[in-house]
Amino acid sequence: MIGLFKDEWFNISILNDNLFLKRYCYESNNNNNNNNTLYTIIVPFDKSINPSQFDPSTINDYFIFLYKNTKKINLNSINKLQYKSNKKEILVSFDITYIHNSNNNNNNNNNKLKSVLISNSCSKKLNLFNNDIVHLKPIKKKLTVLQRVVLLANDNESFIESSNPSESSSSTTTINSKYLVNEEFRNYLVENSILFQSPNNIVIENHQKHKSFSYKVLECFPLLQGTVSNSTTIIIISPDDKILNTLPSNNNNNNNNNNNNNNNNNNNNNNNNNNNNNNNNKEEEVEEEEVEVEEEEKDNKLKLNNNLRLSNFIIHPIINISNNTTTKNEDIGDSNNLFHFTPSSKGILSNNKKFINISQLKSIPTEIDFEFDISKEYDYLVDCLVSLNTLKSLNLFNGSWIKIKNITNNNNNNNNKEYEIAIRIFSITSSLKLKDQVLYLPPISIFNLNIDYKNFLKLSNYEIISNQFELILLKSNKPNINNNNNNDSFPINYPTANRIKISRIKNQNSSGYKSYSHQLEKYFQKKRLLKQNDIIVISTKVNNEEELINSNNSNNNNNYNNNNNNNNNNNLVYFKVEIILCNQFENINGNQIYLIDKNTTSIIQEGSSNSMVPSKIESFYWRGGDQEESKDNSMVPLELIYENEFKTIVDLISPFLMGDKFSFDFNCTLLLNGPQGVGKRTLLNRVAKQMGIHVYEVDCYKLYDFVESKKDWNIRNVLEQASNSTPTLLILKNFEVLEQTAQSMQQEKKESNLSQTLINILKDINDSNTSNINSNKYPLIITVTVNSMDELSNKVRNWFKHEITLNSPDENQRFKILKYLTKNLPIDIGNTVSIKNLSIRTASFLNSNLRALIQRSSINALKRVLSIQQMMNDEIKPIEIYNCGFLVMGDDIQKSLSEMQEYQSSSIGAPKIPNVSWDDVGGLANVKSEIMDTIQLPLEHPHLFASGIGKRSGILLFGPPGTGKTLLAKAIATECSLNFLSVKGPELINMYIGESEKNIREIFNKARQAKPCVIFFDELDSLAPSRGNGADSGGVMDRVVSQLLAELDGMQKSSDVFIIGATNRPDLLDSSLMRPGRLDRLLYLGISSEKENQFKILQALTRKFNLADDVDLRKVVENCPMNLTGADFYALASDAMSNAFHERITASINGEINEEEQNQKLIVYQNHFIKAVNSLVPSVSLDELEYYHKVQKQFSGNNKS
């Protein structure tokens, strides 16, 4: 296929259906027995190529992948075409048509693409238009064979054609064979290589019968598109089959219709209420989120039955992908070309000034091509965008020059400066959902308007500022038609500057030792309109080897910059316009706009300065994070997850940035604590980017030194460097390491002088700035991050004026994170995957853990599909799996979740839901019911406790050892879907003072973060003995008991945390533990006193055994003594299995069984159990059992009282 697809890119040419059928289906000269349909693509084939490169007869062995180019380009710039191989593509069948191209024609048309021919029906199905550019790639048909296909006949005639009437009418027909297609229909599908794509309709033409039959593809498995073979399971369903009522798609369709109606109503309301404030918008978002969660929960309840989908009744679980494979049709038409005029028609339309509403423009997705979707003259970083209706109402042409004036400063400032910008205005398609009567300005243009900081923050939140800005139309000169430069059209009333001086704005990403001449030269290739104090931004991206050599001439000597500061990284560098000189015009108020033309203007870069920067400029510059350069934009938006904490930090920092209204003689210091990986550093970076201040980030491990004087010098050096680039948010990661000293590392609790060091350094810096008239007045915001407050001394903590804690995400926050992570992934949501349930099962997972979970699930899904396809054909590759498409199933996520929970639980003791059911617990029926009343009732009916009556969340299980206390606690957690945190008393005891109490606090903190959760304290008597009776002189155990009691009292406020304790000796426990409100529900787990209960225990323990037919468990139980515990019965079952092992091994050694019998499953016989019973010794003697009965009477009486 090399010769046929050597060009890869082709142009679409659409033919009328009748003409297409006549040429390429019925009367094709290429192949008299062709199977072409209206949905076949005809590819040109030049006979003049070397025949050895391509054999036309092999086309019957191939399909092709069709990839549509989403960006419009000129045919003269074919090199700009980019093919992304790891995306889902459309699988289509094809045929060839012979063409004859001479060498001369080839030489003249090197830049022209060959055309592939499709029918009008095919163009509608594939959403293709004339002159669309597509990429074609062949794939062998055998690699796309599906394992299962489910078809719904659209009419009875189609069903009769494909089904087997004789079998379906038989009374002995199984439900499986009833839905299988007949062999004639199967053979027709295989011989003609019919393509199936879910959930599309398919029309099968039978030329022999001169009929067509129509079907809807309900499912393709495991790929989302492919063909069938003789081994494929093909299911056919009648249109009037009752089984269709079980499909959840009906409910989904109704919900979608309701959602569409609601969306239409919301759009109408939005059009009528353009001036609503932001608080109302936030309330609506919260309400929508809550409604969405409620609908998700309702859907989960409804799908308890609906989840038994169609194929559950036929063969085995399938995938319903009706909601996941629908491709979004991007509107790439030229709907707004009516208002895209030629430059010669641009000019002033009206001299009236208009008050306008402005908002900050969000980053435009990379799928939108500026040149074709907006205009080739559009400057993304400067020009404004509006809706087409707004452009009409302003009586403007697309690309008109306008002046926007900030009229609020006239009232607030005494200097009466008028801050204004001159930019172009463009309209864009409705894909960005721009509101009418609003001008959307990029961050740089908003910043250069010198908006007061209060409105600056509003705009950074994408709010709309009304009636504070004035729009004035500008008259522009007519460009030279013979000049190819598109930037000749500029306003005529702005003079050209003779000289401009710019200075580099100091921050951590820019260096005074590095030259940015190449980047600046590239920036000023276009003419610019600038005024004094404007900000310009460039990227340090290196485009060629010459720039790389020049950029490496000198290195930055800063040893504390993070690793992002290398020469090959793509950071943004900001420059400020300091001085503009012009002979024709005198700059009186410093706000005159000038034209900067590199041919006549001298551009000088000199010195450095301090300034704020535009809000969210990095994500805007890199267009939302799809570029590799914007690494942080691929993160989950933590400002929406931790909304309250984010707002608190912004409110604390804002007064320090309002220098004209507030003046402080101290620094803003903020301590941020939370578990590692929760997102502390990321959240602070988001704060800085929104507020328009620089970030200076340092890892304190680089500052630490065993020599105190050197460590102090490192701290001073970092603080001085950060203060030189203000306004700066200094982030000191792992701050607790600076508290360590040589003595503290040896467990000697000696406080460091860190707080005094910080006080002295900041005092020196502030005194130096105060005495220096030329020093900048911007603030230095000091923030530190720690993983635990326990690592800091009280003296250091008191130095910080504010403390903020980031806890692990709760259930609702995890739901938001998972929704964000899965929004662009092909996940089987609603059928096998529930985001709501997944958010419940990922308790204690952090943002990084959830991201890793989704990544692992995608890999597991790819492995699953790859293994299935390779069983049928081992030539398929992962990239071809991507092209065909596949779904991430619930099993893939469950496997990844189990792996991660296993690792987390073993490494950090994170809670997880166990896998123990009631079937694993034999007997104990009365205890089960009492426990479920205590735990399950407040979970399922929380409204019953809304009146203020406290719930009873503490249970104490006591009794002889081996009676199933731990197993029962795990079963409770499993049945109630609770996370289970098992704690053994001796594990919490530590030899150092205060460490044992700290361990108890951490256990309860983990449980709160992982709620709903059960904390199970095993061997509780070793952790909480009676106070005053301990032998330790230091009173360690007394303090431990007091800490435990304090935590138990605090549990009454947490409605979803339950405490279960287990002990063999309740008489040794501190009596305060068993008062009401703590462990006030005492349950005795004793030895079974009836043979029926013993039988249930043994039955539960052997339910996974391969028992012989002669095994009678009741007879086994009759031979057992009455003082056997659950652990004794476990030993009995284990000994019986061991006896069977010994018998098998002995027979194998003696040659009594052959190899085939050795590989058979191990079977346990009656004699194995009898032998185990005869050798069993009870673990609890009769005297001990009598003692436990006395204890039961004592504490059961106390419990009743």
Swiss-Prot record:
Q: What Enzyme Commission number(s) does the record list for this chain?
A: 3.6.4.-
Identify the residues that bind ATP: G959, P960, P961, G962, T963, G964, K965, T966
GO process terms (BP): peroxisome organization; protein import into peroxisome matrix; protein unfolding
Q: PROSITE patterns, alphabetically?
A: AAA
InterPro entries, per database record: AAA+_ATPase (IPR003593), AAA_ATPase_domain (IPR050168), ATPase_AAA_core (IPR003959), ATPase_AAA_CS (IPR003960), P-loop_NTPase (IPR027417), PEX6_4th_dom (IPR056995), RecA-like_PEX6_r2 (IPR047533)
| Top class in the EC scheme | hydrolase
GO terms for CC? cytosol; peroxisomal membrane; peroxisome
Disordered as annotated region, ranges: 247-300
| Disulphide connectivity of cysteines | none
Q: Where in the cell is it found?
A: Cytoplasm, Cytosol; Peroxisome membrane
Known catalytic reactions: ATP + H2O = ADP + phosphate + H(+)
User: Mind listing the UniProt keywords for this protein, alphabetically?
Assistant: ATP-binding, Cytoplasm, Hydrolase, Membrane, Nucleotide-binding, Peroxisome, Peroxisome biogenesis
- Offer an example of a GO molecular function term for this protein: ATP hydrolysis activity
Question: Compositional bias (Acidic residues) spans?
Answer: 284-297
- Show the ranges annotated as biased composition (Low complexity): 250-280
Q: Which Pfam families match?
A: AAA, PEX6_4th
Q: Explain the purpose of this protein.
A: Component of the PEX1-PEX6 AAA ATPase complex, a protein dislocase complex that mediates the ATP-dependent extraction of the PEX5 receptor from peroxisomal membranes, an essential step for PEX5 recycling. Specifically recognizes PEX5 monoubiquitinated at 'Cys-11', and pulls it out of the peroxisome lumen through the PEX2-PEX10-PEX12 retrotranslocation channel. Extraction by the PEX1-PEX6 AAA ATPase complex is accompanied by unfolding of the TPR repeats and release of bound cargo from PEX5.
Q: Describe the subunit structure.
A: Interacts with PEX1; forming the PEX1-PEX6 AAA ATPase complex, which is composed of a heterohexamer formed by a trimer of PEX1-PEX6 dimers.
Q: Which family does it belong to?
A: Belongs to the AAA ATPase family.
What's the protein called, per UniProt? Peroxisomal ATPase PEX6
Biological source species: Dictyostelium discoideum (Social amoeba)
